[in-house]
Design a protein with these regions (language model features):
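Extended, histidine- and acidic-residue-enriched regions that form the cofactor-binding/catalytic faces
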Residues: 1-106, 110-235
């Protein structure tokens, strides 16, 4: 169920519902994938999990599409907010969700800029919400090899997920893009704070030409498994 598509009486009649909140960013994802890739993935996870869960009833909140976006700021289309703004929005929305009678709030994020992740971890803890932390080792090890290597921004991993849910948004140029292996965690540890200095002059790394909708669907199943497991453990 999508909250924005329900009527007020329909929400009032829900029994012990939980809320899922997709979070992402507006930032470049190569010359081939949409700016809203991270948000699209988070929405896909939440909607699949909500459909799979019968009890408790799960409601998907409208996505928070803006995030802390500095790495891609030199490219057209990047629109970001500060850590303070993100933290404040999470606290406000979480308080409102609680006031509306939702039992728990689950935050689902697929924008992994370190400041975004750190802010969401802190805000979720402050708000009493649950944050599905996909970059924690126990979760990351369940995902694809490209994701585990950290060379996955708009690469095979993310492009496959977009192909699974919105293939019309992936430019056919993806098929001709050369692989660009960049160890993003190592680059971050070395103090590089933007795509250009990391060696991503077209705002992507990994191998988008190897992406497929089939892989995307399989990855969505794994991502959804993790979210459903968290809900069942904590709701």
């Amino acid at each position: 169920m999508r909250l924005a598509e329900l009527t007020s009486p329909q929400v009032e009649n829900l029994v012990n519902p939980i809320a899922m909140w997709p979070v992402g960013a507006v930032e470049p994802h190569g010359p081939h994938a949409p700016l809203g890739t991270d948000t699209l993935i988070s929405v896909g996870m939440c909607e699949r999990a909500a459909a799979r869960l019968g009890d408790p009833p799960a409601v998907v909140l409208p996505a928070l599409a803006f995030g802390v976006t500095r790495y891609g700021a030199a490219f057209a289309g990047a629109i970001g907010i500060t850590e303070a703004t993100l933290h404040a929005v999470v606290l406000d929305v979480a308080a409102s969700v609680q006031q509306q009678g939702f039992r728990r709030l689950f935050i689902v994020n697929n924008h992994f800029e370190p400041e975004q992740v750190a802010t969401l971890r802190a805000a979720a803890a402050d708000a009493g919400a649950l944050y599905l932390d996909l970059v924690r080792r126990r979760n990351a090890q369940r995902l694809t090899d490209e994701f585990r290597r950290g060379s996955c921004h708009a690469g095979r991993y993310e492009t496959s997920l977009v192909l699974a849910d919105a293939p019309q948004l992936v430019d056919s140029a993806a098929a001709d893009l050369p692989a660009n292996e960049v160890d993003m965690p190592a680059a971050m540890a070395a103090g590089r704070t933007d795509f250009l200095t990391m060696g991503m002059d077209r705002a992507y790394c990994g191998a988008p030409a190897e992406a497929s909708a089939e892989e995307g669907r399989a990855t969505f199943e794994t991502l959804t498994d993790m979210l459903v497991e968290l809900v069942r453990a904590e709701a």
